[in-house]
Amino acid sequence: MLKDLFSKKKKYATIPSEQAKQDVPEGIMTKCPKCKKIMYTKELVKNLRVCISCGYHHPMSAPERIGCLLDEGTFQEYDRHLLSKNPLEFPQYMEKIEEDREKTKLNEAVVTGEGTINGFPVVIAVMDSRFRMGSMGSVVGEKIARAIERAMEKSVPFIIFTASGGARMQEGVLSLMQMAKTSAALKLFSEQGGLIISVMTHPTTGGVSASFASLGDYNFAEPGALIGFAGRRVIEQTVREELPDDFQTAEFLLKHGQLDAVIPRHELKDTLTNVLDIHQSRGGDEWHTN
């Protein structure tokens, strides 16, 4: 009996059942990746997907961003009918495209169109990282180039919101061509006096960061956005140096003169309105960057 009294008792861990795991429906709550706070998704969306605890800027979908920036009922979408093909016959590429179309209810990784911001007419392009990580394929480049051309025709400012992992590898050189095509369209627009505003959001990397994302008359970014061409690990291995902790963040780029401002999401519409107001000519119909 004494032996039983001093013997170690076995410890057991309780494993939650599948039913217990499903008690909280998916999508009801969102955990902040920065401060780890768990909040109601509905409250997060109401706060423009900015964490109410630490201010972390969660990604926004293209429809959400358009909805919070443009005046209600003014948005008219361009080129929704343009769809990606598979020119290189890359295995399972079209299956993945179809999956993203079903998941996001979008046809491609960018939404373009026209509308007004506090009464100021603009042409806008908004990338959506949910669709193939916002990668730039031939349709993405074509939609952006066409949007720039429409901004030229209408003599209104062009605003682009970037969120991309870079060029779309499944389309090879056709994807890389979009860097030149979009950059050339922006150059022509700029030569005609057009106003270009670029807003880089998390993440803006690869061929997108090396082309149209960095060619604005104003280059803005959201707080904490990852912005860069090559990955941090690749750069460290190449230069054989340890990089700063904040390397490739919006704040790092601002500090080193590569951005004009880092603007919190709640202040973005007012900032864009002020910029548009400054650049509108006295006549009210023309825009200029001079």
Swiss-Prot record:
Enzyme Commission numbers on file: 2.1.3.15
Residues annotated as domain CoA carboxyltransferase N-terminal: 28-290
Requisite cofactors: Zn(2+)
Subcellular location: Cytoplasm
A GO biological process held by the record: fatty acid biosynthetic process
CC cofactor note: Binds 1 zinc ion per subunit.
GO cellular component: acetyl-CoA carboxylase complex
Residues in coiled coil: none
Gene Ontology molecular function: any one: carboxyl- or carbamoyltransferase activity
Record family assignment: Belongs to the AccD/PCCB family.
UniProt subunit comment: Acetyl-CoA carboxylase is a heterohexamer composed of biotin carboxyl carrier protein (AccB), biotin carboxylase (AccC) and two subunits each of ACCase subunit alpha (AccA) and ACCase subunit beta (AccD).
Function in brief: Component of the acetyl coenzyme A carboxylase (ACC) complex. Biotin carboxylase (BC) catalyzes the carboxylation of biotin on its carrier protein (BCCP) and then the CO(2) group is transferred by the transcarboxylase to acetyl-CoA to form malonyl-CoA.
PANTHER family per record: ACETYL-COENZYME A CARBOXYLASE CARBOXYL TRANSFERASE SUBUNIT BETA, CHLOROPLASTIC
NCBIfam families membership: accD (TIGR00515)
UniProt name for this protein: Acetyl-coenzyme A carboxylase carboxyl transferase subunit beta
